[in-house]
């Protein structure tokens, strides 16, 4: 979605609204670059209102979105102590009136998150994002062992149908390659 060049953004969208109530998305991705200390910014997976797929400041998509954003943040913008290291994965649900706070790396609006060392791996990395019976779960396979490690699980998450899936990435003064190799969406049978 971006090359290892400053001030870029890119995105990919499925423009058909989703009618599934319960779903799981598998992301096959690679984030890598030449810098060893300073790099950024990251990428996002989206499940949003179809009108919310325009370029903007939140990992390449617009702010004040309506729906779900799962952020794969590689750069700590927070000046001062943090309760977590980067790279960091977090989830945010917004009704269109909340902004993602880059200065605090979204920590005040996140549902949950985890540190995940997915950058500059010798192999591709995977993430699974599932929404089943109003439970949002994000898991990763960072070590390429074929085993999911839970990053976050949040109950009582309410997402409507007829939103769209997408992904976007952004670089600022710092950069990285953000390669999205595939997104696969599955309907989950749930009684």
Q: Can you describe what each PLM-predicted range is?
A:
Residues 1-191:
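Polar, low-complexity loop segments and adjacent catalytic/binding residues used for recognizing
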């Amino acid at each position: 979605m971006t090359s290892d060049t400053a001030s870029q953004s890119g995105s990919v969208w499925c423009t058909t609204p989703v009618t599934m109530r319960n779903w799981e998305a598998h992301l096959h991705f690679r984030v890598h670059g030449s810098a060893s200390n300073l790099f950024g910014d990251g990428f996002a997976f989206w499940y949003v209102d179809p009108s919310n797929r325009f370029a903007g400041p939140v990992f390449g998509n617009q702010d004040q979105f309506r729906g779900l954003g799962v952020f794969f943040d590689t750069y700590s913008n927070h000046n001062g102590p943090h309760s977590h290291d980067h790279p960091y994965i977090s989830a945010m649900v917004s009704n269109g009136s909340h902004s993602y706070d880059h200065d605090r790396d979204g920590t005040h609006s996140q549902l949950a998150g985890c540190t995940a060392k997915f950058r500059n791996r010798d192999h591709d990395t995977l993430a699974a994002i599932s929404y089943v019976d109003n439970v949002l779960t994000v898991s990763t396979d960072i070590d390429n062992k074929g085993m999911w490690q839970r990053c976050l699980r949040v109950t009582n998450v309410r997402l409507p149908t007829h939103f769209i899936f997408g992904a976007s990435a952004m670089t600022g003064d710092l950069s990285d390659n953000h390669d999205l190799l595939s997104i696969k969406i599955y309907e989950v049978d749930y009684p």
